[in-house]
């Protein structure tokens, strides 16, 4: 079989992922929801993950690491908490729908201003003119690092 939908999900998981999934099914516990061993074990695993991620990102404390169900939820949480009315964001029309919807909501409901940087006919960033988009109230440039649609990075 030729599998061409890795953008949605990876067909074959590494053995470590398979094992972690089996372990989770066998020892399921809900972190922070009780004092029985499965819950305590799950809480320890979550804390260990927070510590590892905190160290990797040089965060000041493991409590600074927040988990979300998926990238869209994480993105909406981050964008929703960063900006105030009158703030300015630079982005492109080639961003993922989850990014653009969040930014349009900020514009339409929160009074955030958006500017769109140029891309060429293949969706590649065009850096000419970016400097002119920066305003005194610019708080972020929200641009994808690589597109799973065009393959551009």
Model regions and ranges:
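Pyridoxal 5′-phosphate
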Residues: 1-153
